[in-house]
A protein has these predicted regions:
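Jelly-roll (double-stranded beta-helix
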Residues: 1-173
């Protein structure tokens, strides 16, 4: 959630309110019913909903929610979600690591090494940023393929997500 508040309810019994800085990880697995609702008619919700395919089928449904402070991503890559739930991130059933950053003018470069065969993807939520030499503005994204790292620099009030994507997507059958 980027702005506003969103109330969550699901068929597994989870309820809660998501606020700015909160990240929710929901695994549909074998099935779950859920709803998200903004109860405040005067304050819109600004959020991102990101769907990732799991590494395998038939996993049980799951839910987790965590708050990530703005200070934790200022001028650094803050882990939000990864397969092992390491470094304070939420765990996920996919070979993906998702990081967030807030960068501004004068910040040092941020680098994410990509293991052989992995891809990077950067989504710029707000501001402006240079990614591997390509200047992007709010709402833009860059796919990084065939390179060994992702380099973020020259941020201007930049709020970005960086995805480190694995090599084994779920094959549709």
């Amino acid at each position: 959630v980027l702005a506003g508040e969103l109330t969550h309810r699901d068929s597994m019994g989870h309820t809660g309110v998501l606020r700015p800085g909160d990240v929710q990880r929901m695994s549909a697995g074998r099935g779950v019913l859920h709803s998200e609702y903004n109860h405040n008619a005067s304050e819109p919700v600004r959020m991102l909903q990101i769907w990732l395919l799991p590494e395998s089928r038939g996993i049980p449904p799951g839910y987790a929610q965590r708050h990530f402070s703005e200070a934790g991503r200022r001028s650094r890559l803050q882990p939000l979600v990864n397969a092992e739930g390491r470094d304070g991130a939420l765990d996920i059933h996919a070979d993906v690591a998702l990081h967030a950053t807030l960068m501004d003018a004068g910040d040092a470069q941020l680098r994410q090494v990509l293991a052989p065969g992995r891809k990077g993807y950067v989504h710029l939520i707000d501001g402006a940023l240079t990614v591997n030499g390509h200047r992007i503005e709010a709402g833009d994204a860059v796919k990084i393929d065939g390179e060994h790292e992702v380099v973020l620099e020259q941020g201007r009030a930049a709020h970005a997500l960086l995805f480190d994507l694995g090599t084994h997507p779920l094959t549709e059958r």
